[in-house]
């Protein structure tokens, strides 16, 4: 019986790896060399898990930390360790997007300290360009606009957006109820603009969209009548960003980063932002103070009269 189970797990793993290869090649449009590098690094993890008797879909954070420690122990350079672990995290993000896993065991996986990288953030103008790129003449146009306005208005994780229910909407009070990590619920303010776009979407939704049984309460639907998936939202945003001429590497989570950064720049209290994002620790939210300082420095360098004078002098010489 154990032999049959092991064989089934192996077949499933082979299928997953094949789909991941296709995803890297076709969806991410990576070069053959980059795809090979991802696959080589992934094979290191698979070899480790096989030696430990762990199925890929049963992998825990502890398993990944054990694997990461092994990279250090055999003397792999910190930058190479970081590259390998980044590839591993990308693989588990794919498993989440493709609905193979509910949670991401690699989310809290830390690599070696090789420098601090700030998350990508969109400007208000860039967000407007992305939303304006939506074609409202298509069947999904109004739904897509409501999705983006909700992501930016509420700072939701993509999984929270996909699982949002009509019964969670309290428009008269200006709030929505969100179920976050660990099934923890929170109330999040929602903008009048997002409310308007969701109501417009409901007109379309009720005017011909088929809705499958048991999915009637979901806010955002796919064409086949079930709630929209994370990978669909991911591809939607990638497509719209390309159409809008945005070259930054963005994802649904970029809207969450932008939401928090713009609130902080507007003077919002860090604790209030923590509550809206559903962060357990204020330390997680403090990343946005780094972004704010980084942008502030860029503004000063760009507009300070001494810097302007220096740039002009350099142009003359």
Predicted regions and their residues:
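Conserved catalytic core of the tyrosine transesterase superfamily
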Residues: 1-317
């Amino acid at each position: 019986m154990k032999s049959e189970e092991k064989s089934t797990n192996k077949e499933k793993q082979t299928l997953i790896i094949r789909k991941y290869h296709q995803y890297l090649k076709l969806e991410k449009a990576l070069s053959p060399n980059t795809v090979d590098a991802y696959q080589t690094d992934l094979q290191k993890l698979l070899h480790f898990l096989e030696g430990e008797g762990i199925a890929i879909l049963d992998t825990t954070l502890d398993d990944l930390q054990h694997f990461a420690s092994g990279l250090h122990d055999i003397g792999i350079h910190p930058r190479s360790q970081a590259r390998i672990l980044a590839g591993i995290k990308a693989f588990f993000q794919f498993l989440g997007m493709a609905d193979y896993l509910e949670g991401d065991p690699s989310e809290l996986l830390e690599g070696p300290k090789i420098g601090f990288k700030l998350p990508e953030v969109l400007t208000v103008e860039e967000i407007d360009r992305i939303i304006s790129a939506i074609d409202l003449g298509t069947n999904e146009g109004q739904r897509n606009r409501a999705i983006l306005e909700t992501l930016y208005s509420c700072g939701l994780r993509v999984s929270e957006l996909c699982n949002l229910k009509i019964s969670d909407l309290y428009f008269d009070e200006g709030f929505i109820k969100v179920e976050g990590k660990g099934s923890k619920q929170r109330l999040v303010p929602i903008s009048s603009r997002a409310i308007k776009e969701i109501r417009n979407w409901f007109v379309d939704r009720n005017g011909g969209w088929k809705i499958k049984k048991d999915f009637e309460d979901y806010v955002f639907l796919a064409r086949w009548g079930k709630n929209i998936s994370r990978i669909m939202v991911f591809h939607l945003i990638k497509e719209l960003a390309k159409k809008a001429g945005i070259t930054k590497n963005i994802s649904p989570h970029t809207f969450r980063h932008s939401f928090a950064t713009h609130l902080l720049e507007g003077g919002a209290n860090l604790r209030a932002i923590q509550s809206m994002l559903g962060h357990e620790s204020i330390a997680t939210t403090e990343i946005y103070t780094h972004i704010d300082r980084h942008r502030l420095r860029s503004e000063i360098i760009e507009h300070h009269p001494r810097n302007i004078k220096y740039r002009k002098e350099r142009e003359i010489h």
